[in-house]
């Protein structure tokens, strides 16, 4: 009997022997509205204006059965103008969401800035708001503290969104494993070895449990604001819990965009 070679886990790439009938689904049974897309700064990490042809991209999506998309990269001000100009050839295909600059949180007149920006953006055509996980996990205030998503200083955003009837799509939490040590017990060990910057298991950063508590506070304290909690309601590892939230908070919706 030949001696078995020791194999590192990182070298293990097995090929499945499972034989199945191949079924190619070229189009969905029903028209699709993709509520989580990025056609601007977030999606292309910089100047997107020459990185895709709007007409060709839309044609490709329509052929695949996509009826409309929610473009979450509207931003605000001049950037919103650039985004709207980019998608103008097919503007009926796009539902664009904007946002505000939360890094200005501690500036004098922040509340006035938020109200004016959102009103101006709505007049330009945005249909909702988008907020990244940066609010709780990246951006810090003037006291060098991370900003809880349920922070009272952000209240003006949710109130104005309700007044203007703008739904808020918000990314709050990442996969639970991203908040745990990168060790042999972490189910995303291989992924985090390749992308260590995705780990939030660091001193001073909110835990996953704290973020979920903030998320509930946000929903509970702003009943007139319609929220779409991105990526399966922040907690795809526990859909029973997400289901309880959906039953408990009528203003909560979820999207099913992947967080890969």
Question: How would you describe each model-predicted region?
Answer:
Residues 1-85:
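An N-terminally biased module of ancient metal coordination in phosphate/nucleic-acid-related enzymes
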Residues 2-13, 51-52, 58, 209-260:
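H/E-rich (His + Asp/Glu) clusters that bind or coordinate divalent metals
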Residues 6-10, 14, 78-198, 253, ...:
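Active-site gating/metal-coordination segments in enzymes
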Residues 31-37, 68-71, 95-99, 129-131, ...:
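Hydrophobic faces of well-ordered beta-strands that scaffold small-molecule active sites
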Residues 39-40, 174, 234:
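Short active-site segment of divalent metal-dependent hydrolases/proteases
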Residues 44-48, 81-83, 179-187, 237-248:
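Histidine/acidic-residue-rich catalytic or RNA/ligand-binding cores of hydrolases
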Residues 50-58, 78-81, 111-116, 150-154, ...:
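Well-ordered, non-membrane alpha-helical segments in soluble/globular domains
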Residues 196-209:
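A short acidic, glycine-rich active-site loop
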């Amino acid at each position: 009997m030949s001696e078995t070679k020791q194999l590192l886990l990182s070298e293990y790439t097995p090929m499945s022997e499972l034989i199945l009938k191949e079924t190619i689904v070229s189009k969905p049974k029903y028209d699709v509205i993709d509520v989580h897309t990025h056609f601007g700064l977030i999606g292309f990490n910089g100047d997107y204006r020459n990185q895709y042809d709007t007409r060709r991209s839309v044609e490709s999506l329509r052929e695949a059965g996509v009826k409309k998309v929610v473009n979450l990269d509207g931003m605000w001000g001049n950037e919103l103008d650039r985004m709207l100009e980019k998608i103008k050839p097919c503007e009926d295909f796009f539902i664009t969401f904007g946002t505000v600059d939360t890094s200005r949180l501690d500036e004098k007149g922040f509340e006035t800035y938020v109200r004016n920006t959102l009103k101006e953006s709505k007049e330009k055509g945005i249909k909702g708001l988008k907020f990244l996980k940066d609010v709780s996990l990246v951006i810090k205030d003037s006291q060098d503290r991370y900003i809880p998503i349920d922070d009272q200083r952000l209240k003006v955003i949710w109130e104005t969104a309700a007044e203007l009837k703008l739904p808020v799509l918000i990314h709050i939490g990442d996969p639970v494993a991203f908040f745990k040590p990168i060790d042999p017990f972490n189910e995303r060990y291989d992924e985090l070895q390749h992308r260590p910057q995705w780990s939030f298991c660091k001193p001073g950063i909110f835990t996953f449990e704290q973020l979920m508590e903030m998320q509930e506070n946000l929903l509970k304290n702003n009943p007139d604001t319609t929220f779409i909690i991105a990526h399966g309601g922040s907690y795809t590892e526990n859909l029973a819990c997400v289901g309880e939230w959906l039953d408990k908070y009528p203003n909560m919706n979820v999207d099913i965009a992947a967080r890969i």
